[in-house]
Design a protein with these regions (language model features):
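Acidic/aromatic-lined carbohydrate-recognition and catalytic surfaces
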Residues: 1-24, 33-71
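Well-ordered alpha-helical scaffold segments within catalytic/enzyme domains
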Residues: 1-13, 46-58, 122-137, 175, ...
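Solvent-exposed loop and edge beta-strand segments that line ligand/cofactor-binding
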Residues: 13, 29-42, 75, 89-125, ...
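Long, well-ordered core segments of solenoidal/helical folds
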Residues: 18-35, 64-80, 93-96, 143-158, ...
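C-terminal beta-rich recognition modules with glycine/proline-rich loops and embedded aromatic residues
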Residues: 65, 143, 209-217, 222-322, ...
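Beta-strand-rich binding/interaction modules
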Residues: 328-349
Length: 506
């Protein structure tokens, strides 16, 4: 159904769409009240039905998406009962684990992100789409509870979700191991689906911030830079000889394979990258919303907008606006939550915030967006400028694996340290956060990392004797440690990698 809608939207041809209308009609005829009871084992049909509704306007599709969503959890034993009727079970399904498939409670009663992470965020996506479409405040509140729990207590700094290989699932709050992380690529993609639907209901910058975190880190890390190899799992620490080999770590493959049996992530990643325009913009009656600093030419209802972006390496983005009518409308641009200051200009003139400036044009700031209301003319240009400082990030101390450690970010990009840049050993490095002002920013001039911004960070390497245990503390050697964008790791052969680094304060 999703493919049929995508093809219809891209080409205007409805042949496949009509085929899938027949399929959707068959689903509606077979399942529902006074018919076969049932809910999807993997929550994708709900997304498909909602997309079919948006494409065709057929209310039956939306109504049945609601049925499937609201039926879940009414009988937590549904999948176990179904499995007992036959002598086989679908690969990967755990019928008796009612949290695995989010059937432990109704969608309105669920307080915590649990179970199979992809199933969960796909279900949340359909919930949020339905809530926004029908302006359902109760359903949106349920989505908001799940969003907050997931992003505030169960998400890696890279945007990865679903921390355990057991059931490809969420675990306990703050349980975010780095070297055993699962963080499936599809789960990160699903979180972007969810965020986009939440933005339809509430223009809050936290949803766009999450999309940005995923797109520059936890999603594109799933594909090798040449596009030929892929990760299913996205760890935050890798140690060859342990990762991929020892029990408990076998799922953490230290190099991207060419393919794998469950090949959901590669095509999902490709469709995400090729459909970024859907996630970058929204449009209401009197506002155009820009959620992401992505260079492109957008053809919208009120205007054509050309975006020229130097993001994420430099802090400069411009919007050239060609209005289609003479009406006054606002352009709302998301300002990333990490920015402490920024400058906005219109046709070279600096804009100030709020109307107290008595200027003809100004901007207002609300929930992570700047709003510029104007009667636009051809080739009016908005420019956003800001500094791109290196930021030291610390985890909540409830994340026990990260106590005493720090991670580095610049802009939206999370950084990682690889052995190939650091004498083959990142485990004995301690970055000196007190000397961060001495850090050097380098733009790689050649090779597979060409064009990327790399960081050279003052650090200390610990060196010990051969003894397993000793009363003598390790020797400290001052070094410069190099960090690369996390999404680029694993492109230069088998080696160590680490995001959260031990720190030293001099």
């Amino acid at each position: 159904m999703e493919a049929a809608v995508a093809y219809y939207e891209a080409t205007g041809k409805d042949k496949l769409l009509k085929v899938m209308e027949g399929m959707a009609g068959h689903i509606i005829d077979r399942f529902g009240p006074d018919k076969l009871p049932g809910i999807p084992g993997h929550q994708e049909v709900e997304i498909g039905l909602m997309r079919m509704y948006h494409a065709t306007g057929n209310e039956a599709y939306k109504k049945h998406a609601r049925y499937f969503l609201e039926e879940r959890g009414k009988n937590p034993a549904f999948f176990a009962e179904e499995a007992a009727k036959r002598d086989w079970n679908h690969f990967g399904m755990v019928p008796k684990d009612i949290k695995y498939n989010q059937s432990h409670a109704t969608i309105y009663e669920q307080e915590e992100a649990v179970g199979h992470s992809v199933r969960a965020v796909y279900m949340y996506t359909a919930m949020a789409d339905l809530a926004a479409t029908e302006h359902d405040e109760k359903l949106f509140a349920a989505c908001e509870r799940l969003w907050n729990n997931m992003t505030e207590k169960k998400m890696y700094i890279t945007g990865g979700i679903g921390s355990t290989v057991e059931g490809e699932a969420f675990t306990k709050e703050y349980e975010l191991p780095n070297d055993m992380a699962y963080a499936e690529t599809c789960a990160s993609i699903g979180l972007v689906f969810f965020a986009k639907q939440m933005l339809k209901m509430s223009k809050n910058g936290k949803y766009a911030d999450a999309m940005e975190r995923e797109l520059y880190n936890g999603i594109i890390s799933g594909m090798q830079l040449d596009g030929k190899r892929f990760f299913y799992v996205n760890p935050l620490e890798v140690n060859p000889g342990v990762s991929g080999e020892i029990f408990g770590y076998k799922h953490v493959i230290p190099e991207r394979p060419g393919w794998y049996a469950c090949a959901c992530c590669p095509p999902n990643l490709v469709r995400m990258v090729t459909s970024l325009g859907r996630y970058a913009w929204d449009e209401d009656d009197d506002v155009i919303y820009s959620h992401l600093f992505i260079g492109q030419e957008a053809r919208l209802k009120k205007a054509d907008i050309k975006v020229v972006s130097e993001y994420p390496w430099k802090g400069h983005v411009s919007y050239s606006i060609t209005p289609k009518t003479g009406d006054e409308f606002a352009v709302a641009i998301h300002i990333p939550g990490y920015l402490k200051s920024f400058e906005v200009t219109l046709n070279g003139m600096r804009l100030k915030e709020n109307s107290e400036t008595k200027a003809d044009v100004f901007y207002s700031y609300r929930d992570g967006y700047i709003y510029i209301k104007n009667k636009w003319h051809d080739n009016d240009v908005i420019e956003i400028s800001f500094n791109m400082d290196i930021r030291v990030i610390y985890a909540n101390t409830k994340v026990r694996e990260d106590i005493g450690c720090a991670a580095l970010q610049r802009g939206p990009v999370v950084y990682a340290f690889e052995g190939v840049d650091n004498d083959d050993d990142v485990q004995s490095l301690m970055i000196d956060v007190s000397r961060l002002n001495e850090a050097q920013i380098q733009t790689e001039a050649e090779g597979i990392l060409k064009g990327a911004v790399l960081l050279d960070i003052p650090a200390v390497r610990l060196e010990s004797s051969d003894a397993l245990y000793s009363e003598k503390p390790p020797r400290q050697k001052s070094v410069i440690a190099r960090a690369i964008p996390y999404y680029m790791w694993g492109n230069r052969g088998l080696n160590q990698m680490r995001v959260w680094m031990h720190t030293i304060y001099n």
